[in-house]
């Protein structure tokens, strides 16, 4: 199984910090954000870890990996975008990567700006038992907070509905940027894209997919930070500094 880390955005909401530096290379408690993502994947035994980046920031990623990574499994995939107006979106980047790399699945996908203390092997274990797509969920434990996220409604551990930023959340289980797509899941992804599906937010594909195919979930507890702005960046920094 391969893993993909999505790091192709321009993070304009975090300017000026990210105007000339990719968000995933910002320092967090002594090391770049991206290295924490690598750490979370360390024990999962992937054949390759592919970091998808835009062409504007690609040289900085190349320099970081050549200077700091001894892991030959890690490689860059450079998207054809140099600014915000040209960005492919998360799903557009995956579509290009899947086709260029001829990836048939299964594949594990992690957001390059998601930090957590989750035991992600649980997602792989569930995939191996079910051969189904698996999404990592996190219980935000607050209905008002749930209105800010993409929220899953479950039947057992199967996601039967998914809605982005609902005014009346069906649960408090938020989708993280940890996904595992099976072989059939990638085929379904291509069907979605070829049918004109939105190529930006990953949640749009999840909304479409759960109504047509079995998508299972692992509900995690612990700590999870989706670093989309300066406030969540500061919260993640504080969490990491306090960790033993």
Language model regions located:
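Conserved donor-nucleotide/metal-binding helix-loop-beta segment in metal-dependent transferases, i.e.
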Residues: 118-146
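Residue-level signal for inorganic ion chemistry
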Residues: 34, 97, 113, 152, ...
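Conserved N-terminal catalytic core of the sugar/cofactor nucleotidyltransferase
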Residues: 2-5, 13, 31-110, 122
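Active-site metal-binding loops of divalent metal-dependent hydrolases
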Residues: 10, 112-114
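Anionic-ligand binding region
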Residues: 141-169
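Catalytic-core segments of class I nucleotidyltransferases/pyrophosphorylases
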Residues: 108, 115, 124-128, 158-244
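N-terminal nucleotide-binding beta1-loop-alpha1 segment
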Residues: 1-20, 26, 44, 214
């Amino acid at each position: 199984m391969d893993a993909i880390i999505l790091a192709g955005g321009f993070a304009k909401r975090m300017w000026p910090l990210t105007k000339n530096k990719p968000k995933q290379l910002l320092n967090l408690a002594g090391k770049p954000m991206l290295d924490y993502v690598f750490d979370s994947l360390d024990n999962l035994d992937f054949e390759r870890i592919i970091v998808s980046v835009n062409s504007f920031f690609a040289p900085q990623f190349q320099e970081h990996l050549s200077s700091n990574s001894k892991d030959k499994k890690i490689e860059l995939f450079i998207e054809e975008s140099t600014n915000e107006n040209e960005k492919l979106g998360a799903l557009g980047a995956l579509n290009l990567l899947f086709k260029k790399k001829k990836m048939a699945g299964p594949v594990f996908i992690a957001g390059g700006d998601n930090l957590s203390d989750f035991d992600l092997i649980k997602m792989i274990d569930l995939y191996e038992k079910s051969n189904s797509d698996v999404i990592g969920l996190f219980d935000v434990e607050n209905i008002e907070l749930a209105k800010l996220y993409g929220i899953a409604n479950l039947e057992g551990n199967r996601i039967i509905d998914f809605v982005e930023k609902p005014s009346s959340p069906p649960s408090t289980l938020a989708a993280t940027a940890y996904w595992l797509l099976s072989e059939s899941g990638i085929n379904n992804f291509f069907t979605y894209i070829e049918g004109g599906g939105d190529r930006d937010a990953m949640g749009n594909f999840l909304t479409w997919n759960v109504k047509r195919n079995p998508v299972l979930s692992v509900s995690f507890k612990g700590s999870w930070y989706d670093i989309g702005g300066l406030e969540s960046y500061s919260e993640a920094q504080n969490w990491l500094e306090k960790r033993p």
